[in-house]
């Protein structure tokens, strides 16, 4: 199997787990400057999947690394969300993280906790496939967008 096919197969296999990660992140309120719980959740997941380095910087952002090559590639996603506004305008609880009809519902699902969940799964796949080479891949999960 070609490497691309392996990656796609793993991504498909982890689809439900990625949705569950997103659901958990949505359930974790993380308004700007109040992201500590979300940062701890992201850190825990990166450690669970064996990332080479995981730390929280002085601002509270999670910095994770896979690989140890000289060239560096960084991919960023923010873990904070904007306020809910008028809760009456929501059809579902904005912090339910409900998974229904192939979608994950809640505050931050598309901006940007969905991207964060995908980044965590991508890092997991890199580790499982033994990524090593010219690059250090940094996944940064930043606060206070």
Predicted stretch roles:
Residues 112-145:
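Acidic/histidine-rich catalytic neighborhood of metal-dependent amide-processing enzymes
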Residues 2-109, 128-134:
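Acidic/His- and Gly-rich active-site-bordering loop/insert found
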